[in-house]
């Protein structure tokens, strides 16, 4: 019989421990990541870098989230896509959400983090166009993508500026034809977001500063919020901590991206190598300045909303679009999932 030594006992103990460890790993696997599907407002561009930074730096993973981020086809479309269950989360126009919630309150998703706090909606016209104010739209032809946020809000602009909408011809075309349709004179004005049009024009060899002008909705009483993180009622009800974790991860990425915009654009380029990094960096900076830099963020922080301001926006849209009911502020946005106020960015530059 072989003598049992101290070293053999130690080896046996280690082997037993390793075996038990394997059993425990099998019995208690690592916590599964929650898989989420997100749809953007548009194609992969500089301003979408926030989301990809959160993914690349592991912020979503640290919150137990495995994210899939798909390109979008208009700022209004994420709302029905999230409402239908096709996606868990969307980056879309909060005004389209107000419209949806007015008509289908039981299905409507809810906003949890507003990123575009200034209205980007515009009608672009040629620099030499006789159109100077919204009233000049009468008798003209305006065009845009069917799901364009500015087009969806045009009835509200008509109401506020006393335009007779019946005197304005509206035509639809694919988003990639917008600048071409305008510059060739096939339409008198094109709906869109200011920076979307500006930078699409630049990529097409058009100088928007010399060849275009913009009739901006915000200059005519439409002090509206715009794109926000929209989540499904199902996700809010069944996995509120996942929603909170998503917002926390995104907020960290926003802070990082504000410090290093080139990193944000590089994260986009990783997914879409054909982008022009220099143009997308310029687009990123312009989006910060024109669409995300409302003075209120110094007080309430980026991501948050002013309830009184949102209530006024809801009233404007309900009245102008003759919606069937007036949603309450808490139906459209919840503060529940925001990080502590001290953690929200108070300045962008």
Enumerate the predicted regions with their spans.
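Periplasmic-binding protein-like
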Residues: 115-125, 209-235, 247, 286-292, ...
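Short, surface-exposed acidic
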Residues: 165-169, 208-212, 274-287, 324-331
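Secondary-structure end/capping motifs
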Residues: 237-320
């Amino acid at each position: 019989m072989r003598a049992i030594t101290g070293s053999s006992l130690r080896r046996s103990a280690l082997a037993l421990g390793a075996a038990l460890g394997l059993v425990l790993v099998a019995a208690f696997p690592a916590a599964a990541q929650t898989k989420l599907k997100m749809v953007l407002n548009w194609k992969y561009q500089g301003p979408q870098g926030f989301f990809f930074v959160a993914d690349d730096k592991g912020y979503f993973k640290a919150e137990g989230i495995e994210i899939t981020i798909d390109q979008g086809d208009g700022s209004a479309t994420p709302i029905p896509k999230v409402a239908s269950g096709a996606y868990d989360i969307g980056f879309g126009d909060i005004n389209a959400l107000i419209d949806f919630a007015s008509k289908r309150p039981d299905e409507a998703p809810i906003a949890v983090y507003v990123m575009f706090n200034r209205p980007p909606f515009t009608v672009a016209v040629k620099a030499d166009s006789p159109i100077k104010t919204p009233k000049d739209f009468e008798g003209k032809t305006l065009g845009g993508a069917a799901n364009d946020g500015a087009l969806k809000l045009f009835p509200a602009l008509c109401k506020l500026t006393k335009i007779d909408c019946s005197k304005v011809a509206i035509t639809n075309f694919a988003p990639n034809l917008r600048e071409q349709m305008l510059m060739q004179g096939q339409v008198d004005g094109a709906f869109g977001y200011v920076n979307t049009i500006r930078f699409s024009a630049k990529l097409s060899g058009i100088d928007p500063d010399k060849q275009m002008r913009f009739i901006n909705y915000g200059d005519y009483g439409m002090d509206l919020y715009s794109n926000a993180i929209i989540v499904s009622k199902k996700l809010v009800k069944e996995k509120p901590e996942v929603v909170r974790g998503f917002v926390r991860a995104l907020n960290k990425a926003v802070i990082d991206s504000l410090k290093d915009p080139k990193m944000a654009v590089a994260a986009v380029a990783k997914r879409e190598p054909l982008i022009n990094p220099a143009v997308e960096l310029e687009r990123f900076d312009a989006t910060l300045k024109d669409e995300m830099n409302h003075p209120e963020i110094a007080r309430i922080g980026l991501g948050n909303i002013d309830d009184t301001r949102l209530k006024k926006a809801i009233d404007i849209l309900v009245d102008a679009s003759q919606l069937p009911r007036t949603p309450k502020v808490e139906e459209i946005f919840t503060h529940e999932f925001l990080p502590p106020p001290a953690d929200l960015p108070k300045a962008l530059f």
